[in-house]
Amino acid sequence: MPSEILNKARAYEAKHGAAISPAERPAYHMTPYVGWLNDPNGFSYYKGKYHQFYQYNPYDVRWAPMHWGHAVSTDLLHWEYLPCALAPDSPADNGPGCFSGSATEMDDGKQLLMYTSVIAEKQPNGEMRDIQTQSIAIGDGLDYEKPACNPVLTQKDLPEGFSKFDFRDPKIWRETDGTYSAVTVCLAEDGSGAAVLFQSKDGFDWHFVTVLERCNNQYGKMWECPDFFPLDGKQVLMLGPMEMLPKGEFHNGHNVIAFIGSYDEATHTFTKENVQLMDGGIDFYATQTTLAPDGRRIMTAWLQTWSDTEDKPKGCKWFGQTICPRELHIKDGRIVQTPVRELDAVHGKRIFHENVTVQSETSLEGIKDRVADLTVTVQPGEYRSFILKLAADADHHTSLTYDPYTSQLTLDRSYAGSRADIVHTRSCKVRSQNGALKLRILLDKNSIEVFANDGEQTMTAWIYTPQSAQDITFAATGSDVNLTVEQYELNL
């Protein structure tokens, strides 16, 4: 029986979410039914549909005590809203609420949600602090019940010295023998993050197994949103470090990184061999993956970052969205990302320009839109820079600039329309190919996702530009550049 708090949230979203027209939302990126969205949660395939829950405040476009919103899809592009799944309505979570978590299927066909339950607790010095534990809820894909045994993991289940104030974000899965496994993150005794593995035979009674990886103050401070999965013969530990320093390909603040290595299941030993940044853009955090029925490893993420959440469109009825889900593979020891192939099925009218030579700023016939799948292939050459402007008009644009001499690709949304003092420019290094470059760009009203060289690097950003800014232009400095441009309209 849903609680009064949950019923209130469901009634509110049913009234106010239904009042938001499809035209007010992106075409193929998931947004909250109404109000606020941050981390995607419970990304899973269950009863023939993809389920994507999310951190949710239905009542306002800002963070507040967390609920779990809920949506389902058959193609990862069109999302149907279901009633709010979880609310802060139990003794384990009736403070800041139901934080991030995940989902898996149980032996009896029910769906098990595992989430971070948070309450405020008075400390000996009189200070109120949030205490983080892990709880579960069991349901049928629509309604979920929290058992009386919650929380199922607390500080007493952690190694000595690990913090009860920073212990969160369980990612749950089933082993081949049916065992339930979950990786969480916690603040270790050295003041930096650790990824901790727990297991259970039934999903209710959990025990500590091992510390999979420690930050040792090398990759930021506290970690968030862990995931642990096999991929193309390797094992991946993916997570979101906080308070990173700009070393190598990493940038200040929140990042998403992946440790790639091997895993000994008998000893539960993870050995990292490589580490990489998962997105070099501005708005990308809180990743989570699931295994599709056909064996693809598919990733979702929050198309936002915490530092710019106060920069909202005036009068917006919703805030926050998730990326277009991405397929993951390993190539030459690194993860590559491509948009899910379901996007190809909605390709409409094709506009194609082959071997076009440009230098001064140039528009190409038919190449313009704010909802499109665009591929630009730059041939090797002696140009000094290539500049692509998107969502452009006389006053606005977001640019991608490639310097073949440094192999730097720069995303700049300074002229996208925001007046806020936030990060507007990021650069990442792409593989040097004597000036050759391939960019696949997903445009969806107020977002841009860039896949460089078949997904070897990605850059993601939210943009604040009026929808009337539709133009796309091409230019080069130093000498001419030769391009092939392909754009698909999307039949959504």
Where are the regions a protein language model picked out?
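Beta-rich accessory regions
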Residues: R10-K15, I257-L492
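Beta-rich carbohydrate-recognition and catalytic domains
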Residues: M1-D169, R174-Q218, P230-D279, L303-H353, ...
